C-alpha cells in the first residue's frame, strides 16, 4: 500500500536532490546538443499521469487486456494527428524510441544478412544505419556511403554502390548532416535496383512538419522519426508511410508488436498526441523557422572567426564544426565548453583520423536555445563565446568570464521558471 499524498521531496531526498539539480542545470546552461529539446508543460503532465499504470498490449480494438477503452481513444487520436501532421496514410505511434522504430522497419522488410546501403556514421549517419557495434551492423550487411569533397551527400557514389551491391534497402537520413537530402533522387536510385527506400527523419521531423524541409514521405516506402529533437515532444519513436499498401502496414505493425515490443507506453503516447497537436499550431512553424535562422547565424559567425563548418553552411537545425586546424580535439572542446555552462557534443567529422571517443569535431544544434527564446542576436553571442574559449583554451580567466555571461543570458531566457 502506498501513501497517496507522498511526494518525492519528503520520501526520497537523494533522487529529489538530483532532480532539482538537473532542473537548475537546464535553466543555467546553454543547450546546444542537436538531439535535445525542451518539452511543454502539457507533454510533461501527460507523462506523469495515471496513464502510466495501464498495460495495453496490442492495438486499439485488438488488445490482450481489458479496460483499454480510454487508452484506445488516446492512441487513435495520436495516430490521426501523426498522419495529418506528416501527410501520411499509415502511422504507428508505439515505438519506444527511434532506434526501436528503425529495428521494426528492418525486421519487417529484411532478412538477416540482407545487404543494406546507409550513411557512414563518421560522415553523419546514425548508429542504426549500419554501425558495426549496433544491431543493424550485426544483423545485416551494410555498405556505407558518405559525403563528397564539398561536404554534400555523394549521390554518384550511392548510385555506384547501389548498382554494384544491389542492396535490398537504401537508408536515407542522418544525425550530423547540415544539408538538404534529395529524397527524389534516392528513390530513383532505389527503383533502379528494385530496392526499398527507408528514411530516418528523426533529426528533421519538426522542420518537415512545419514545411521547411522536404517531406520524405512523398518518395520513401517507409519513414521513421523520433518524437523529441526538433519535433519537441516526448522521447519516443514513430513509423509513417504513404499509399495503400495494407500488407506493408500489417508487416510494420507486427514488427513493432509482438515483434520487438510488448506493452506500449500509454502515458508517452498521450504525450506524443499532445506534441503532434502543438506542432500543428501556427507558432510551431515560426519556431522552426527561427531554429534554422539561428543555426545559419551561428555557422556564419564561426566561419567569420576562422572555423571550418562541414559543408560550409546549414539548411537545418545543426552544424558540424571541424576543429582539425585548431589544435584541439572534439573531446577537449566539449569539456572546456561544459566548464563555461555551454553544452555541445564531440562528433566525428568526415574521414576523421581520431577515434569516436576523441573526435576532431563538435556538433551544434539550435532547437533548445530557440525553444527558450534565443534569436540571431543571442546565437551570434553564443558562437563568439565558443570561439573565445576555443581560441584561448588555456585561459581560465576567459572561460570564467564567458560562464558569467552565459548565466546572465540564461536568466533573461528561463526555460520553465
Swiss-Prot record:
InterPro entries: PyrdxlP-dep_Trfase (IPR015424), PyrdxlP-dep_Trfase_major (IPR015421), PyrdxlP-dep_Trfase_small (IPR015422), Ser_HO-MeTrfase (IPR001085), Ser_HO-MeTrfase-like (IPR049943), Ser_HO-MeTrfase_PLP_BS (IPR019798), SHMT-like_dom (IPR039429). (6S)-5,6,7,8-tetrahydrofolate binds at residues 121, 125-127, 355-357. Homodimer. Belongs to the SHMT family. The modification N6-(pyridoxal phosphate)lysine is found at residue 229. Its EC number is 2.1.2.1. GO terms for cellular component: cytosol. GO terms for molecular function: glycine hydroxymethyltransferase activity; pyridoxal phosphate binding. It catalyses: (6R)-5,10-methylene-5,6,7,8-tetrahydrofolate + glycine + H2O = (6S)-5,6,7,8-tetrahydrofolate + L-serine. The keyword Cytoplasm applies. Pathway: One-carbon metabolism; tetrahydrofolate interconversion; Amino-acid biosynthesis; glycine biosynthesis; glycine from L-serine: step 1/1. Pfam families: SHMT. It is found in: Cytoplasm. Coiled coil: none annotated. This is Serine hydroxymethyltransferase. GO terms for biological process: glycine biosynthetic process from serine; tetrahydrofolate interconversion. Its cofactor is pyridoxal 5'-phosphate. The record marks 228 as: Plays an important role in substrate specificity. The gene is glyA. Catalyzes the reversible interconversion of serine and glycine with tetrahydrofolate (THF) serving as the one-carbon carrier. This reaction serves as the major source of one-carbon groups required for the biosynthesis of purines, thymidylate, methionine, and other important biomolecules. Also exhibits THF-independent aldolase activity toward beta-hydroxyamino acids, producing glycine and aldehydes, via a retro-aldol mechanism.
Amino acid at each position: 500500500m502506498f501513501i497517496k499524498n507522498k511526494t518525492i521531496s519528503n520520501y526520497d531526498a537523494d533522487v529529489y536532490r538530483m532532480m532539482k539539480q538537473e532542473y537548475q542545470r537546464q535553466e543555467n546552461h546553454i543547450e546546444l546538443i542537436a538531439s535535445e529539446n525542451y518539452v511543454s508543460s502539457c507533454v510533461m503532465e501527460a507523462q506523469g499521469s495515471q496513464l502510466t499504470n495501464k498495460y495495453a498490449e496490442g492495438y486499439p480494438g485488438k488488445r490482450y487486456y481489458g479496460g483499454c477503452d480510454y487508452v484506445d481513444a488516446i492512441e487513435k487520436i495520436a495516430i490521426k494527428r501523426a498522419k495529418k501532421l506528416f501527410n501520411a496514410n499509415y502511422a504507428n505511434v508505439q515505438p519506444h524510441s527511434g532506434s526501436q522504430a528503425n529495428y521494426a522497419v528492418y525486421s519487417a522488410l529484411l532478412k538477416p544478412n540482407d545487404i543494406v546501403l546507409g550513411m557512414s556514421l563518421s560522415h553523419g549517419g546514425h548508429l542504426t544505419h549500419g554501425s558495426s557495434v549496433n544491431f543493424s551492423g550485426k544483423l545485416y550487411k551494410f555498405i556505407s556511403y558518405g559525403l563528397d569533397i564539398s561536404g554534400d551527400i555523394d549521390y554518384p557514389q550511392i548510385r555506384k554502390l547501389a548498382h554494384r551491391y544491389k542492396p535490398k534497402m537504401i537508408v536515407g537520413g542522418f544525425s550530423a548532416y547540415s544539408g538538404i537530402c534529395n529524397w527524389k533522387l534516392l528513390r530513383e536510385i532505389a527503383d533502379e535496383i528494385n530496392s526499398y527506400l527507408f528514411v530516418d527523419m528523426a533529426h528533421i521531423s519538426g522542420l518537415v512538419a512545419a514545411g521547411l524541409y522536404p517531406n520524405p514521405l512523398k518518395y520513401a516506402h517507409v519513414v521513421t522519426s523520433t518524437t523529441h529533437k526538433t519535433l519537441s515532444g516526448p522521447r519516443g519513436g514513430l513509423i509513417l508511410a504513404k499509399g495503400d499498401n495494407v500488407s506493408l502496414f500489417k508487416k510494420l505493425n507486427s514488427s513493432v508488436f509482438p515483434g520487438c515490443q510488448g506493452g506500449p507506453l500509454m502515458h508517452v503516447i498521450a504525450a506524443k498526441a499532445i506534441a503532434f497537436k502543438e506542432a500543428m499550431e501556427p507558432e510551431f512553424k515560426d519556431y522552426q523557422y527561427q531554429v534554422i535562422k539561428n543555426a545559419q547565424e551561428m555557422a556564419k559567425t564561426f566561419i567569420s572567426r576562422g572555423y571550418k563548418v562541414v559543408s560550409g553552411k546549414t539548411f537545418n537545425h545543426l552544424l558540424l564544426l571541424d576543429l582539425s586546424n585548431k589544435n584541439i580535439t572534439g573531446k577537449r572542446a566539449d569539456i572546456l565548453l561544459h566548464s563555461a555552462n555551454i553544452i555541445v557534443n564531440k562528433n566525428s567529422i568526415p574521414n576523421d583520423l581520431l577515434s569516436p571517443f576523441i573526435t576532431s569535431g563538435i556538433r551544434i544544434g539550435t532547437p533548445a536555445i530557440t525553444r527558450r527564446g534565443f534569436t540571431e542576436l543571442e546565437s551570434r553571442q553564443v558562437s563568439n563565446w565558443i570561439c573565445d574559449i576555443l581560441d584561448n583554451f588555456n585561459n581560465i580567466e576567459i572561460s570564467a568570464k564567458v560562464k558569467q555571461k552565459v548565466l546572465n543570458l540564461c536568466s533573461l531566457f528561463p526555460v520553465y521558471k
